[in-house]
């Protein structure tokens, strides 16, 4: 972990609940193990068989829906934005998704790492490249955009 990440530390579930408005069953980040200022982060999702989406996707062979992998990436990016711009004073809106690719299925028992790297920022618009990995292997990737807005203006 580099020096900037050490300064900002990690985020356990209690910190994530302060950073993000999402709650069960839509909170898709269990922990953030590394934050490098507003440049990058690694979020963790422990996938369990008890998650509600597995009852229909698919009952005989449960696979985590790709859209939820994208949402986990967006939540990890959102935590970076919220931590940098002021916890509780702003909302982070998911704006764009480009170049999404799904490489391998994610199943119960997997530990997904969401690697999020800020590519650029212009005003209140932030762009990120995101990779989702299981056991070091790429399972999904996407470029996403987020907009930061004041809660008063939302």
UniProtKB/Swiss-Prot annotation:
Q: Which InterPro entries match?
A: FabA_FabZ, FabZ, HotDog_dom_sf
Q: Which reaction does it catalyse?
A: a (3R)-hydroxyacyl-[ACP] = a (2E)-enoyl-[ACP] + H2O
Name the Enzyme Commission number(s) assigned to this protein: 4.2.1.59
Subcellular localization is given as: Cytoplasm
Keywords from the named record: Cytoplasm, Lipid A biosynthesis, Lipid biosynthesis, Lipid metabolism, Lyase
- Name the GO terms of the biological process aspect: fatty acid biosynthetic process; lipid A biosynthetic process
- Example of a GO cellular component annotation carried by this entry: cytoplasm
Domain of life of the native organism: Bacteria
- Indicate where this protein is primarily found: cytoplasm
**Gene Ontology molecular-function annotations:** (3R)-hydroxyacyl-[acyl-carrier-protein] dehydratase activity
Q: What class of enzyme is it?
A: lyase
Active-site residues are 57
Biological role: Involved in unsaturated fatty acids biosynthesis. Catalyzes the dehydration of short chain beta-hydroxyacyl-ACPs and long chain saturated and unsaturated beta-hydroxyacyl-ACPs.
Q: Which family does it belong to?
A: Belongs to the thioester dehydratase family. FabZ subfamily.
The name of this protein is: 3-hydroxyacyl-[acyl-carrier-protein] dehydratase FabZ
- What organism is recorded for this protein? Rhizobium meliloti (strain 1021)
């Amino acid at each position: 972990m580099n020096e900037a990440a050490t300064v900002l530390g990690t985020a356990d579930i209690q910190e994530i609940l302060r950073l993000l408005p999402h709650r069960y069953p839509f909170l898709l980040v269990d922990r953030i193990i590394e934050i490098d200022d507003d440049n990058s982060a690694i979020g963790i999702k422990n996938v369990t068989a008890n998650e509600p989406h597995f009852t229909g996707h698919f009952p005989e062979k449960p696979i985590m829906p790709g859209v939820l992998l994208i949402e986990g990436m967006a939540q990890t990016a959102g935590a970076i934005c919220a931590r940098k711009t002021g916890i509780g004073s702003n909302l982070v809106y998911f704006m764009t998704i480009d170049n999404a690719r799904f490489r391998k299925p994610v199943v119960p028992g997997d530990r997904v790492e969401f690697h999020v790297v800020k590519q650029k920022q212009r005003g209140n618009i932030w762009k990120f490249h995101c990779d989702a990995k299981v056991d070091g292997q790429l399972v999904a990737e996407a470029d996403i955009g987020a907009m930061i807005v004041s809660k008063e203006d939302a």
